[in-house]
UniProtKB/Swiss-Prot annotation:
UniProt-listed Pfam families: Cyclin_C, Cyclin_N
Matches recorded under InterPro entries: Cyclin, Cyclin-like_dom, Cyclin-like_sf, Cyclin_A/B-like, Cyclin_C-dom, Cyclin_N, Cyclins_cyclin-box
Similarity annotation: Belongs to the cyclin family. Cyclin AB subfamily.
Keywords: Cell cycle, Cell division, Cyclin, Mitosis
Disulfide topology: none
GO terms of molecular function: cyclin-dependent protein serine/threonine kinase regulator activity
Tree of life domain: Eukaryota
Organism: Hydra viridissima
Name of the protein this chain belongs to: G2/mitotic-specific cyclin-A
Length: 420
């Protein structure tokens, strides 16, 4: 018992000694912290006293005018309007402080402000910077009234129409269409197929696109893939339908939200080919095209040119131009010989001639980049194609545009084209 009591007593003494040591250490740290804090406060106080006499308070820094000419002040002097269209009040208003309260502008003041803005833009004519036509409403009006050309991009209000970039996108597509054009004489090098077989294939694809309610761009891409593939590969007539089915499968995967499955393409070929054959042909097509699937088609240009022609969303002009452009898909000579943008422009020109008095306007010429002389050859061929549409053996497009859904435009009687 004696040793046990002694053990517990020693243990308690040791714990008390440890606690006293920790308390002393804490007090020392607190003293060091207080001393450092006092030194920081003293340093900050001294700094504020010295800075008081060396810098201007932020509240009044805008009122201090040094000897150096400020950039903003120099710019205002440069943009000062001529004396014959301004007065002293206009100059004083431009130099007022931002902190002052400005009165509401009267009609006279607004007129002077517009004159000032126009003169300011005139001073930058010699500047290397290029002003965008989308800067202001006044500049848009000046831009659209140039030579009777309408500013169609200022009418675009949808989120994805991008009026600031619409013309740049169009210019890029026109440059790209030359890169992805099929060879103009590829059908002459095919030993087992000809243009008539190609026309039958495209006519069948039109029926397939209507059966599965595919968007028009899918059909145009399918034809583009077929022509580009046949430009590099020689195909037997027994495999031509397989090429068409595989090309439409690729185009549907690229454009559609819910594309038809492989089994459906096997079904529409009446089980002529197996699913494995369709997939193998799809692989060969992608390899031959080097996976360049996003290519310009006639449909890309047609939508913009229709907008430039003031065509309403469900107008006969729109449906007739679409009908004529689809007719060119069947004709190998036209679809391969001419660029998609030229076919789109010529289709609108022929449709305008049938429905309106003016076939080609300055606005269409400005936004398409084609004048009427550039389109002469393509216009004549599309017109002849339109005249022979009713007697053509391939009637899928003719029947498609006979429906009221498309304004029955294929029933319209073609007119004689004037000599341009």
């Amino acid at each position: 018992l004696f040793f046990q009591k002694k053990y517990f007593l020693d243990k308690q003494l040791n714990q008390n000694a440890i606690q006293i040591y920790q308390d002393n250490l804490t007090n020392q740290n607190n003293n060091i912290g207080k001393k450092a804090k006092l030194e920081d406060e003293k340093h900050a106080h001294n700094k504020s006293i010295t800075s008081k006499y060396k810098r201007v308070p932020l509240a009044s820094i805008s009122n201090v005018q040094g000897s150096r000419i400020q950039p903003t002040r120099a710019a205002k002097e440069k943009l000062k309007p001529p004396q014959n269209i301004s007065d002293s009040q206009l100059v004083n208003d431009s130099l007022k402080s931002s902190n002052s309260i400005q009165a509401h502008n009267t009609k006279n003041d607004l007129h002077k402000e517009n004159l000032y803005n126009e003169s300011a833009l005139d001073t930058f004519k010699e500047s290397p910077m290029v002003f965008s036509p989308f800067l202001s409403d006044s500049s848009c009006k000046k831009y659209s009234s140039l030579n009777g050309i309408q500013d169609i991009d200022s009418k675009l209000h949808e989120v994805f129409e991008l009026p600031e970039y619409a013309q740049d996108i169009h210019n890029y597509l026109k440059k790209s269409e030359a890169k992805y054009r099929p060879k103009s004489n590829y059908m002459r090098k095919q030993t087992d197929i000809n243009s008539s077989m190609r026309a039958i294939l495209i006519d069948w694809l039109v029926e397939v696109s209507e059966e599965y309610k595919l968007i028009p761009q899918t059909l145009y891409l399918s034809v583009s893939y077929i022509d580009r593939f046949l430009s590099h590969m020689s195909v037997l007539r027994g495999k031509l339908q397989l090429v068409g089915a595989a090309c439409m499968l690729v185009a549907a995967k690229f454009e559609e939200i819910y594309p038809p499955e492989v089994a459906e393409f096997v079904y529409i070929t009446d089980d002529t080919y197996t699913a494995k054959q369709v997939l193998r042909m799809e692989h060969l097509i992608l390899k031959t095209l080097a996976f360049d699937l996003s290519v310009p088609t006639c449909r890309d240009f047609l939508s913009r040119y229709l907008f430039a022609a003031n065509a309403k969303p469900e107008s006969q002009l729109k449906y007739l131009a679409e009908y004529l452009s689809e007719l060119t898909l069947i004709n190998c000579d036209i679809s391969v010989k001419y660029a998609p943008s030229m076919i789109a422009a010529s289709s609108i020109c022929v449709a305008n001639h049938m429905l309106n008095s003016i076939p080609w306007t300055p606005t269409l010429e400005f936004y398409s980049g084609y004048n009427i002389q550039d389109l002469r050859s393509c216009l004549n061929e599309i017109h002849l194609l339109h005249l022979a549409a009713s007697t053509n053996p391939q009637q899928a497009i003719q029947q498609k545009y006979k429906s009221p859904k498309f304004g029955c435009v294929s029933s319209l009687v073609p007119l004689e084209m004037p000599c341009f």
